[in-house]
Every structure is written in C-alpha cells, then in structure tokens.
Amino acid sequence: MEIVYVYVKKRSEFGKQCNFSDRQAELNIDISPNPELAALYVERNPVDTGIQCSASMSEHEANTERFEMENCGVNHVEGGWPKDVNPQELEQTIRFRKKVEKDENYINAVMQLGSIMEHCIKQNNAIDIYEEYFDDEEAVEVTEEAPSAKTINVFRDPQEIKRTATHLSWHPDGNKKLAVAYSCLQFQRSPMGMSHDSYIWDLENPNRPEIALKPSSPLITLEYNPKDSHVLLGGCYNGQIACWDTRKGSLVAELSTIEFSHRDPVYGTIWLQSKTGTECFSASTDGQVMWWDIRKISEPTEVVIMDITRKEQLENALGAISLEFESTLPTKFMVGTEQGIVISCNRKAKTPAEKIVCTFSGHHGPIYALQRNPFYPKNFLTVGDWAARIWSEESRESSIMWTRYHMAYLSDGAWSPVRPAVFFTTKMDGTLDIWDLVFKQCDPALSLKVCDDPLFCLRVQDTGCLIACGSELGTTTLLEVSSSLSTLQRNERNIASSIFERETRREKILEARHREMRLKEKGKAEGRDDDQKEEETALDLDELVNKAEEEFFEVIFAELKRKEAEALKKKPKPKKASIEVEGEDELEDIAGEEEESGIIMGEDTGEDDMDEKNEGGAP
C-alpha cells in the first residue's frame, strides 16, 4: 500500500512525553485450570457449517422525472414585405421602399426617433463603451498556499534485474502517457541477463506498462515526436539511433547503421521543429553532434565535432553529455560536456570553425542538465557537480546566479514551463528540490524526499502541475505540486526579468574589474621585466667600461716600459777601464747616479742592465 499523504504535526501537539523504563516481570493474577470443567468437555463430531459463495447483492431503487422531447421547426422569411411583394426581386422592393418613404406616418416616426438616435450616436463617438481597460494584463490568480507536493503514482520496472530510469518523455497530446528509458550506466558492469526493454506507461494504470519498446541495445534517451505522438526517437548505449512507430508494434521501425553512428553512448536526442517533423539530432560522449532524418536514418546528414580549438580533430573533442535546443532559436543549439564546459554552437555557420560560437566554463564535473528559460531564452540553467547555475549569454566568464554546494551530487534539473522564476533539481540522496527565485534565492522553496534511492532524471509536464522523477532502481515517481508552484504569480515575469538583468549587470561590472586588475598585473610584470633588463644592461656597461680601462692602462704601461727600455739602450755605457779614480768624492757621485737609475726602472732595469752587461761582455 502506497503512502499517499503524510500528515505532519508539531512536537508540542503530541502531549506529554511518555517515559518508559525496564523492570522485572511481575505476576499479578494466576487462575489454575478447573479439572471438573475439563471432564465435562465433549468434542462434537461431525459439525455442520454453512458457506455462502455467491457475491453479496443489494437492491436499490431510484425515481427520476421523465424527460420528454419533441421536434420543433421555424421557417423564417424576411419580414416587413407584403405578400404581393417578392423580396428576391430588386425592382419590387425599391418601388415599395419609395412608397413607404412618402408616407406621413413614416416621416413623423423618423423625425421623432432621429433626435434620440443622434444623441446616442454622439455618445458612442465620444466614449467607447466596449473598451477593455485591463485587456493587456493577464488574469492571474493570487494564491497564498504554501509550496507543497504529493505523490500521485509510482511506476516500477517490471524486470527482476532492476535498471536505472535514465530518461523520461511526456506524451505530446494530453500528457496522459509517459515514456521511460531504462539502462545500466555503469561501464562494463551490466549484469548477465539484463533486459533491454523500455516502456510506455499509462498514468492511470501503474501496474502494467502499456507498450514495451524492444531495442537492440539499452536506451539512454527516449523522446516523443511533438508532431506525431506515435513516433519515438531513442539513443542507444552502443551509439545507434532508433525510431519506433507504436502503430507498428514494439520492434524498431528505423535504425542507424553502426558504421555511421556514434562511438559512445548517446546521451541526448532532440526533435527539430521542421515542416516534415522527421528531422532530429543527437549528441554523445564521443564528441560528435549528428543530424538525422528518420526517412533515411542509415547515416547522418551533418556532423559537428565538439573541438573547442576549432581544428576539427576528434581526439581533441569534448564528450557531450547533455543537449539543448530552443525552437525560437532554430539556428542555435548548446551542448554540455563531461569537462564542465557549455559549448554554444551555430548550425548555419559557413565553416566548421565558425559553428562553435563560444564556451561557458564553471562546473567541476559533467553537466547533466542544460535548458534555456522558456520565458527568457538568453538565460539558461546548468546542473552539474554539487550546484546548479543560471547563465546569461551576455556574460561568458561566469554564471550570474548559482546555488550553494550541496552534500549530495546533483543529477538533473529543469525549468518550470509556467513560471519563469521556478526550477527543479534532483539529487543523489533521493531528494527533489524546488527553487522559487521570487520567494527566496539562498535555499529551495520546497525540498521533498521522494525515495531512498538516488534520483537520476526528472521531467516536468507542460502544465507545470506534474513532475516525474526516475531513480537508480528504475522506479518512476509521479508528483503533483501545489497551485502556488504551478500558477503564474502577479508581476512574476517583471520580477524575474529584473532579477536576471540585475545579476547580469553585476557580473559585467565584476568582469570589467577583474579585467582591469589583470591588465594592471600584466603591466607590473612587464615593468619588472624592463627594470631587470635595465639593471642587467647597466651591469654590462660597467663591466665593459672596467674592462676597457684595464686594457687601456695595460697598453699605456706596456708603451711606457718599451720607451724606457729604448731610452736605456740609447744611454752611453760607462767604460770602467778608462775611468781614473781621482778621489772618493767622484766615486760617490757615480754610485749615486747608478742608485737613482735602479730606483726608476725597478726590477726590469736590473734585468736590462744584466742583458747589456752580457752583451758588452762583463769581465
């Protein structure tokens, strides 16, 4: 039996708390059996018993009034004409009108009614009594009900080996059916004997699926065709694209070939808003986005490689794990990657490099959900790692709004189709968070524990009243939110627009400030480099000057030595044999001259003298 609604009561309303304690068992009364009564007991055998096997019926009577009906007919002929005048004859009617207009009673009646009609006509010309003063404003129902949600139904995977509900899709006509894709996302850990079937459920019959879809490989994505509710598009784990027509049965109607399909699991498939309703595109973790036409699905019509370096190299491509397309922007699409980068692309670009317009980086892990706001397409929601972020196309460096980091990993998210300021997120602890930016921005307006298993996907109905959540064990829970979360509030569009514009302006100011700081740091770094270069240049100049001075003085000293040596060579040599020593005074004078010449020349002079003596032949 499912819990439909949980009644919550404050602790103070339970009354006084009961304090129990343990104690030993006590015997309050002991009645022994009476052997006399046991002796009087007689067992009846056999025993006659009556059984009524027919269904219980009751008689009811009702007395209703008899409703009598009869057929009536009216034949209307243009009145005001005599019997002898045929209204179909133009000449007879003109002749009769002229006759009546000449009648005095007709003239008097027209004169009397003319003044009254003239007054009414003037009033009509002056004031438009049929003007709708508040026609531009939408009729908004103001609700003061607190945000709440309740479980409507639960759809469980009928297979014994449970699989993860990886994707959900609502039936486009009336939203009375729900298509669920089942697969095992753990790499190379699929259990033996696991079924590949996915199912279409009827909301009023949760016990048994309406149709089973039988692909060749487990489905990761499954989407209804918005123009033909009998056609579904699926992305397989082996990279193939499959198409079903429920009128033809459970088997695949169209299937792409392995050679021209994706190399990795297909995590995103979207139908395009084309005239034929047969065009779609898909994305995979192999880094490719492919366009298909289900009339010829054997190979893609176009391929775009998610290489942000714009070199069209598949080995550098980023793996796509989420896909977004807005019908109001038919040439643009966005891709969420495993590396936490959102790539904005233009399909109609002339060259492959121009197809990747820009990137948005802000998540630390894969982006599991990516969706534009249905009211303001330039703002989009991303869900990854531990937070959800709201971006603006005008601010590329960072998101304009984001949630706090949660303890559990976020797995999916979506905008409300009826309220521009409301979005939903699912977490791996089995919790569904409903955020209302008008109500509060720091915390979710409602946090609901859906199940104990991790939630992997969610999908919101077009009316915004119902939310379907898929879990790790294949359980799809259908929730109904309160009217306060599914009804457009008064002035909510203006408030949401002002919130997004305000946060966008704030991010632009911060980006400009950061840009200035980076330029200043770059200028300082360049200045430091210039100072270092100037210091190095100054040191080099000093070294060159010192070296030049040393070389200059060496040349000068060498030249002086050479000149002194030449001067000594030209000086006449004293002849000791011819000198006549006349006295001690003359001898002292000669010795003094020799000492002076030895002091001037130093050691070199001595050496030169020795050379000269050797040349002259010392005795």
Curated annotation (Swiss-Prot):
Q: Which GO terms describe its biological process?
A: cilium assembly; cilium movement; determination of left/right symmetry; outer dynein arm assembly
Location in or out of the cell: Cytoplasm, Cytoskeleton, Cilium axoneme; Dynein axonemal particle
| Stretches the record annotates as Disordered | 566-619
Matching SUPFAM superfamilies: WD40 repeat-like (SSF50978)
One GO CC annotation: microtubule
Q: What InterPro entries has UniProt attached to this entry?
A: Dynein_IC (IPR050687), WD40/YVTN_repeat-like_dom_sf (IPR015943), WD40_repeat_dom_sf (IPR036322), WD40_rpt (IPR001680)
Provide the residue intervals of the WD repeats.
214-254, 261-302, 362-401, 405-445, 450-489
Per UniProt, the ranges with Acidic residues bias are 581-597
Enumerate the PROSITE patterns for this protein: WD_REPEATS_REGION
Provide a Gene Ontology MF annotation, just one: dynein heavy chain binding
| Alphabetic keyword roster | Cell projection, Cilium, Cilium biogenesis/degradation, Cytoplasm, Cytoskeleton, Dynein, Microtubule, Motor protein, Repeat, WD repeat
The task this protein performs is described as:
Part of the dynein complex of respiratory cilia.
Subunit details for this protein? Consists of at least two heavy chains and a number of intermediate and light chains. Interacts with DNAAF2. Interacts with DNAAF6/PIH1D3. Interacts with HEATR2; probably involved in outer arm dynein assembly. Interacts with CFAP53.
Question: What family is reported?
Answer: Belongs to the dynein intermediate chain family.
For this entry, the protein name equals Dynein axonemal intermediate chain 2
Q: Which gene encodes it?
A: Dnai2
